[in-house]
Amino acid sequence: MMINALRHIEKIGTELITFSDDMDGLRKVPENIPNDEILKKNLGKPLTAIPDPFGKYQSFAEHNNTMLKKFLKKFNFEFSFKSSTENYKNGTFNESLKRVAEKYDEIMNIILPTLRSERRKTYCPFLPLCPDTGKVLEIPMLNLEKETGKITFNNNGKKIQTNIYDG
C-alpha cells in the first residue's frame, strides 16, 4: 500500500527490496515441514547450509526464498530480492562491517543495555561460523583487530580466528 501511495507522488522513486536473512542459524523446526529430521540435525546452521527438506532446491533457504518470490509475484509486486548470504560473500556488506568494527565500543554501549542478562554475556555484532560444526555461534568475542577485520572467539576452549569480511 505504501509503495502505491509513493508512486502517485511523481518526484519520489520507489523500490521494494525483499531481504532474506538466510545466513541466520535455524533456531527451531517448523511443525509443518516434511522430513523434519533433516532440519533437526542442522539446527543452528545457516539456512543456506541446510538441505531442502522438500527435495526441490539446493538449500532450505533457497526453498523459502523461492516461495517468498512466488508469493510476491502472485500479487504483482515489483521487487528486488537480496540474500544476506550472497551479500556477505560478494563483499557488499564489507564497508558496513568495517564501520561496525570502527564503532564497536559505541555500538556495544547502545545494544547491551537493551538485552537480557544471559544474552548480554554472549552478544557480539559479528556471528562466526564454527569451523567444526558449521553452526552460527553466538559467543563473546575475545579480540577485534579493527584494521584487518580479524576477530577471535573462544568456542568451548578452542580459539577461533576469522575475518568479518567476505562472508
Kindly label every feature range from the protein language model.
Residues 73, 77-167:
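Active-site cores that bind ATP or allylic diphosphates and position pyrophosphate for catalysis
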Residues 1-108:
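N-terminal Rossmann-like or analogous alpha/beta NTP/dinucleotide-binding catalytic cores
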